[in-house]
């Protein structure tokens, strides 16, 4: 990954300048920047655990970024820092270049700007109707009822919540429907950054597809910066622009999807793997077949192979005519 040195802000010490020079996935104007973050559970106790160890990372504005790593790698701890749900022991979290803890009394405003959907958010539903649950956040923002309705309808459309269940109790819904309602409740607040921890955990393939398609469409149509934590490299490949790989409380690598998946050997070394179809396409390329890079789905691979075979067929027919 390209690492470039940036000019230190006025008054920043040499150590901070060195830290910003080692930021992974670096961009000039990141939406979120982590600078040398360390987070310790049970600090100064016999049970001390270093969940994050000197993490520096940029999250690009408007992108859909996936964070992947094994249990205990630090990914869930990291996303709770983005909106100040927890506070690092060392380092800074910057949102649009501003330290989110510069004015601690204003941290509540940060949480409106960075929406966080925890794992299994359906357990947080509590209102009498689906509509009221999705509308809860916007109403707390003191919006007019007309704007609340507009936001509820928009969020419901993105997450696949049908109109005919709006007056039902959320507790009468299936698990997948509850999940979509819970995610819609955060989307309806229109945060600048939407962070989701394993949004499709426990869902069947159809439910996973519905959730991720809605999130991808939300990102494309609104320009909202979206961050997804997932254990599935298939999901990373299919839906994400950028990928962050975590291992042993550190960011192992970060960059575009193509950049990260090109380092298949390093991923396998930490027990992760690229999608099977991508691995097959890479083997075909190594064998001399003109397979394009960046094929992560069966449909895309099939289309590319058909095109290659058709081109070879046309070439053979051309030789026969001559």
Functional labels for PLM-detected ranges:
Residues 169-173, 177:
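Conserved ABC ATPase signature
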Residues 190:
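Conserved catalytic motifs of ABC-family nucleotide-binding domains
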Residues 194-197:
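Catalytic Walker B motif of ABC-type/P-loop ATPase nucleotide-binding domains
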Residues 83:
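Helix-to-loop junction immediately C-terminal to a conserved catalytic motif
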Residues 92-109:
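ABC ATPase NBD Q-loop/coupling interface
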Residues 146-164:
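Conserved ABC ATPase "signature" region
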